[in-house]
């Protein structure tokens, strides 16, 4: 007896994100996946006419942003380096754009900003960009 094609859990999560995006629950999604699923994920987004951006994360993972074009245009300007190197302000904007709990984002921002201020005496140009 032939076993039916079963989607890996990662791809089921992706399909749920696509469903939520199409239903208007989300305007933008950030999904981290194993590189081996890149072709499947991109093919699925393209078949649904959903815009996306791919950002490498290490050697075997990818960040896949997808959603409204105006959101992705902002992502192209904000996320110009790995996520762990974003400034507290960039991190806050990204989390807010992704629809994360606003109070949790505010708390995270204050924690990161205070850590940064404590590390570099208020001069958070380059030394503290990787505070996370």
Each predicted region: which residue ranges?
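Domain-length accessory/inserted modules outside core catalytic folds
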Residues: 1-132
